[in-house]
Design a protein with these regions (language model features):
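Short S/T/G- and acidic-enriched coil/turn segments that sit immediately N-terminal to beta-strands
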Residues: 58-63
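Catalytic beta-strand/loop cores that center a nucleophilic Ser/Cys/Thr
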Residues: 221-332
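Pro/Thr/Ser/Gly-rich low-complexity, intrinsically disordered linker/stalk tracts
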Residues: 3-40, 84-97
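Helical hinge/lid and interdomain linker segments adjacent to catalytic or ligand-binding clefts
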Residues: 102-207
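Beta-strand-rich modules
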Residues: 1, 65-85
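A glycine-rich, often tryptophan-bearing local segment used as a flexible ligand/cofactor-contacting loop or short
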Residues: 160-267
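A short acidic/glycine-rich loop-to-helix N-cap element
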Residues: 112-113, 334-352
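Solvent-exposed loop/turn segments flanking beta-strands in beta-repeat/beta-sandwich domains
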Residues: 36-51
C-alpha cells in the first residue's frame, strides 16, 4: 500500500483524485496503482513517475507499472477536467523489492501453535498470504537466511506470562533479527512481542509499561482504540487504518476492536511518557519530544485517553542505524480470537493487520 505521505500542489482546475495507493503485486515487480475519482467528469487522468507521463481515459481508476526496477518510486496521479485544466497532483511513495513475508513462532511448525489468538492469527495469515512462510526461532538460530523476507510478523500472546520466550532471546536470534531490521527489513509485532523492539535495541527510552496476561474476564462494553492522539494528531489517514470506519467519542476518533463478551485484556503498552521527560501529559512539546527522541509515530491509545499519557500502537521510523520500519500493536483490545462469542469487529483486526503488512512491504 502507499506510504500515506502525500504531497499536494494547489493549482486552478478540477478536483483531484483521492486515496491513491501503490502496491507491489506479490511475487512480481509489478506496481499496481489505484485511486478514487472525484465527483465530476474528467477528460483524462495522468500517472507520473520517473519523468514519464502515462495518459489514461477520464474514467480510469487503476494502472500497473510492469517489471519495475528494485528502487524507490514517487508516483503521482493528476486528473483533468473537461476544460483540460489539471487538478492538484497527488503523490505517493513505494519501494520495490522482495515481497515475501514470514510468520514467526516458537514451535517448530505452525501446527504446534497452541494459544488461541496466535493460532487464529496464523490461520488468517496463511489464508490471505498463501506465499507466506512459517519461520521458527530455532530455524533462525540455525542460520535461516532472513534477507529473503520483506516483513517478519510475530504475535506473542500468552495467558501465563508477559515474558518473551527463551527461544526468541537466544543471542544468535536477537542478532539475526536486529541485522534484518538494520538492513531495512520490516517488523510487525503484536501484543507481548512489541517488547522485542527493546530487545534488538531499536527502542531505548525506558518508559513505564503495562504488560498483562491471564485468562481474562467478562465485560459488556465495546473497546475501541483512539486514533486522534491528544485530540490534535489525527491518524485516521495512516495507511494501517485504511478502509476502517471510525466514530466520535468524547472529541476523539475511535475505531472499535472488540465487542461485548469475554476479553483477555492482554495489554502491552507504554505509559507515563511525558513524566519520563518531566513534562505535563497535555504538553504539545512532550509529544514532539517523545516522537523525535525515539523517531516514532504514535498511532493509537486507549479510547479514554485525551492526552499524551501513553501509547498503545506505534510506528518506529527508519534511523541512521536501523533502516527498517516497524509497527507495534500492543493495545489489549486487539484480540485475534474472542473466547465464548463472535467478535463483531473482527474485520477491523484483520484489516488493520493486512494494511500493516502491506504498508511495511512498501518501505
Amino acid at each position: 500500500y502507499s506510504t500515506g505521505q502525500t504531497i499536494s500542489f494547489t493549482r486552478e482546475g478540477g478536483a483531484s483524485v483521492q486515496d491513491v495507493i501503490a502496491q507491489q503485486v506479490d511475487g512480481t515487480n509489478n506496481i499496481q496503482i489505484k485511486w478514487v475519482l472525484p465527483n465530476e467528469k474528467l477528460s483524462k487522468v495522468e500517472v507520473r513517475y520517473d519523468n514519464k507521463k502515462i495518459e489514461l481515459k477520464g474514467d480510469a481508476v487503476n494502472y500497473t507499472i510492469e517489471n519495475a526496477a528494485n528502487k524507490k518510486y514517487t508516483i503521482g496521479v493528476v486528473s483533468f477536467n473537461e476544460e483540460g485544466q489539471s487538478s492538484e497532483s497527488v503523490y505517493t511513495d513505494i519501494r520495490v523489492g522482495k515481497t515475501k513475508v514470514a510468520f514467526l513462532g516458537v514451535t517448530p511448525t505452525r501446527d504446534g501453535i497452541t494459544d488461541d489468538d496466535e493460532k487464529a492469527a496464523a490461520d488468517w495469515f496463511f489464508n490471505n498470504y498463501p506465499t507466506g512462510e512459517y519461520l521458527s526461532f530455532d530455524e533462525i538460530a540455525n542460520g535461516a537466511d532472513l534477507s529473503q523476507y520483506r516483513v517478519l510478523w510475530w504475535i506473542r500472546d500468552s495467558q501465563q506470562t508477559t515474558d518473551l520466550p527463551a527461544e526468541s532471546l537466544d543471542p544468535s536470534v536477537v542478532e539475526a533479527i536486529k541485522k534484518f531490521h538494520i538492513d531495512g527489513g520490516g517488523l510487525l509485532l503484536n501484543t507481548h512481542a512489541v517488547a522485542y523492539l527493546y530487545t534488538i535495541g531499536r527502542m531505548k527510552a525506558k518508559f513505564n509499561t503495562e504488560f498483562t496476561s491471564g485468562d481474562g474476564f467478562d465485560n459488556g462494553d465495546t473497546w475501541n482504540m483512539n486514533v486522534y492522539i491528544g485530540k490534535a494528531h489525527d491518524e485516521t489517514s495512516h495507511p494501517i487504518y485504511r478502509g476502517l470506519e471510525w466514530k466520535w467519542m468524547d472529541g476523539k476518533k475511535v475505531i472499535p476492536l472488540i465487542g461485548a463478551g469475554w476479553k483477555e485484556n492482554h495489554n502491552s503498552i507504554y505509559k507515563d511518557l511525558c513524566m519520563y521527560y518531566n513534562m505535563n501529559n497535555t504538553d504539545e512539546n512532550a509529544y514532539v519530544k517523545i516522537s523525535e527522541d525515539s523517531q516514532i509515530r504514535i498511532l493509537a491509545t486507549w479510547d479514554g485517553i485525551n492526552d499524551y499519557f501513553m501509547m498503545a500502537n506505534y510506528e518506529t521510523l527508519p534511523t541512521e542505524e536501523f533502516k527498517g520500519t516497524a509497527i507495534a500493536i500492543g493495545i489489549g483490545a486487539f484480540e485475534w480470537n474472542q473466547n465464548r462469542s463472535v467478535n463483531p469487529y473482527q474485520k477491523n483486526i484483520e484489516q488493520t493487520t493486512h494494511n500493516a503488512i502491506e504498508y511495511l512491504k512498501t518501505k
